[in-house]
Amino acid sequence: MTMTTVTRKQLFINGEWRDAAGGKTIDVVNPATEEVIAEVPSAERADIDAAVAAARAALDGPWGRLSARERGRLVWKIGENLLAKADEIARLETLHNGKPIFESRHIEVPAAAECFQYYAGWADKIHGETVPVKGNYLTYTLREPVGVVAAIVPWNFPLLLTAWKVAPALACGNTVIIKPASQTPLTALALAEIAAEVGVPAGVINVITGPGSSVGQMIVEHPGIDKIAFTGDTSTGKGIMKGAADTLKRITLELGGKSPNIVFPDADLDAAIRGATTGIFYGKGEVCAAGSRLLVDKSIRGEFIDKVAARAKKMAPGDPLDPKTRLGAISSKKQLENDLRYIEVAKQEGAQLVAGGGRADIGTGKGYFLQPTIFDGVTPEMTIAREEIFGPVLAAIEFADVDEAIARANDTSYGLAAAVWTKDIKKAHHVARRLQAGTVWINTYNIYDTAAPFGGYKQSG
């Protein structure tokens, strides 16, 4: 593994790079090597106050005076420059997150760029209405920016989820304060640099780094912030709801999941096997919509699980910077320990380990690598069937018929995504309508489009 120089590692406030007011920093660690690759500021209240003031001034000043079409052009240029710098940005994403460079370079950076370019087209298509009312009066509505928006971003898709929040906010005329996860701040800082290069006015995009427990909390409670857009775990989302209540901020929450991948015996089983493995092992399973529960008809369960396990055993983790690697490093030591704890709990509760189950060594003796892990014989009350692990750990559960498949799929506090595998299109749509999930895929998994909504039921936000 070769090193990449990290050029931007300060706060970005009002178009300027600066250290935190208190001078404190936090380490950014490459999870594949366990080496510190950067130190970034740990912001304090004074830094957040400065970012809010800059965002408010830009909203009331140069950004607010731009026409919608001019604003859209700038948002488009951000996407354009992301693509132009895709190699550099993808490398940063892999270095601080541990995901394979193939995913960063060929999937996630292009998807982030597409997000900016998609929403750029919306900037001049947001209209008010003229309302017919009685009497000799003219009544009309305007759609106005919410104001200063804080985007609190998790560590699993640092760039892409930043784009999901920032692009629509900018297109609608808001200004933004980005709070990346403390483990993965580098691509948010790179994005701020790109925005400045294309001419986005100072104060429109600000980046504040530091721990969520302190910096994130101060952002949530700040009276000068009008809206919070958060992606992360459900418990943190609940805390944000409580913290935002005192100032009655608008919030959007995209939270956890325990998504079922449902395989019926009449499915294309080879395709379903591929879908079951990519559904859980893409992104190392650190995906809110990961297909972490595999529900299989009992008539095919044994052979099907054997084939999924055989495929998983061939997916050895590797150097994330190797273009051939398809399974990278777990994002942090803390997350690896969390994954291993769940694996031990599954064993203790009687689940049958059929693949993986331990740390992996890619030959360096370093790095937070985990074997792709599959448990068979999982029952709905087991911990790994109910709690979000957020790692490459699959729980296989059998069902007897369509009704039991639906009941078991819905037997969760989450409802972000699901998939149905069958050649019977009538059955597919019947099941999809009864599933309590924001996104339901049929005979595929992990297909996203910027034009499609992405939300959930229950505690998925």
Where are these regions (language model features)?
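Terminal low-complexity tails and localization/encapsulation signals of metabolic enzymes
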Residues: 1-40, 73, 77, 125-152, ...
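Structural signal for hydrophobic packing residues in well-ordered secondary-structure cores
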Residues: 56-59, 63, 79-86, 90, ...
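Rossmann-like NAD(P) dinucleotide-binding subdomain of oxidoreductase/dehydrogenase enzymes
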Residues: 127-271, 399
